[in-house]
Amino acid sequence: MADIYRFPKFSYEDNGTVEPLPLRTGPDKKAIPYIRIIKVGDPPKHGVRYLDLLLLGFFETPKQTTNLGSVSDLTEPTSYSICGSGSLPIGVAKYYGTDQELLKACTDLRITVRRTVRAGEMIVYMVDSIGAPLLPWSGRLRQGMIFNANKVALAPQCLPVDKDIRFRVVFVNGTSLGAITIAKIPKTLADLALPNSISVNLLVTLKTGISTEQKGVLPVLDDQGEKKLNFMVHLGLIRRKVGKIYSVEYCKSKIERMRLIFSLGLIGGISFHVQVTGTLSKTFMSQLAWKRAVCFPLMDVNPHMNLVIWAASVEITGVDAVFQPAIPRDFRYYPNVVAKNIGRIRKL
């Protein structure tokens, strides 16, 4: 059983909405490219910006031709068929140009893709034709990038391993950063277990403009019967001295003094941002890696939900602080479904 504190609406209503990507097609029945920029923090209105970019598009394979060996093979452009959709996160860089120049450079990229496997399935991106607007990101683009397949591809099983695959960029998601920089809570701190402590988790409720059931993301009904999605993130631990009694009022007062402000960004698809505008205890501040603004990309928190809603309209409709007993340190975490050292199973 957990106790809940509901944050007031003003804490998320200003920047808690993301507009959808418009899916429009041209005369060739192909999607018209579009760039969507959202601001997090207080970035400058003009001039140099720090932009985090996520390229969205389609995985395509060459269509099989029936007139092999004809002269037309040399003159006609290769046609492609779509085999899936996905994304390519290219990170943060300092950008000087316009949005349309950036969109043109992104759609002109030649990106080849390979599906492979390590400990899990991976997608390999190799990039060519990097235009001048993308030079701030060229260090990453030229080296090639590898990502967890379940984070960047909606259906990685649809990508063939015996055919050439290209990634055609159609949309660009950009997050313009101001004083709020991208700071993630380190995994070691997020997994921290302290005795005699209360875990402070945030339950974020979203409303989206698309139906998600057919893609495997089941909504829940709120008190008004509206369909909502939700996810949880870990903020930190509240610890009291031995002998002190925890109470809901004590935990709520700690949270209220932080004066948290919430917003949505487009880092990795959809991202949840938390800014501390009030006071923090030293213990809590250390758990936030001494940052007053942290980012939770949904790509890391709930990859499948992120893949389904990253092009849709998304709105925060509620944020709750959930106070739960911290997981005891002697509880073991099992990241694998196969138990080791049992029967014939031995750890390599």
Curated annotation (Swiss-Prot):
Principal subcellular localisation of the protein: virion
This protein's record includes keyword Phosphoprotein: yes
PTM description: A large portion is phosphorylated in the cytoplasm, but not in virion. However, this phosphorylation is not essential for virus replication.
GO MF entries: structural constituent of virion
Motif YLDL motif, chain ranges: 50-53
Assigned keywords, A-Z: Host cell membrane, Host cytoplasm, Host membrane, Host-virus interaction, Membrane, Phosphoprotein, Viral budding, Viral budding via the host ESCRT complexes, Viral matrix protein, Viral release from host cell, Virion
Subcellular location per the Swiss-Prot or TrEMBL entry: Virion; Host cytoplasm; Host cell membrane
Keyword check for Iron-sulfur: no
Membrane topology: Peripheral membrane protein
Functional note: Plays a crucial role in virion assembly and budding. Forms a shell at the inner face of the plasma membrane and concentrates the HN and F glycoproteins. Acts as a negative regulator for transcription and replication by sticking to the nucleocapsid. This effect might be regulated by the cytoplasmic interaction with tubulin that dissociates the M protein from the nucleocapsid.
Family, as annotated: Belongs to the morbillivirus/respirovirus/rubulavirus M protein family.
UniProt comment concerning the protein's domains: Late-budding domains (L domains) are short sequence motifs essential for viral particle budding. They recruit proteins of the host ESCRT machinery (Endosomal Sorting Complex Required for Transport) or ESCRT-associated proteins. The matrix protein contains one L domain: a YLDL motif.
Name of this chain's protein: Matrix protein
Native source organism of the sequence: Sendai virus (strain Fushimi)
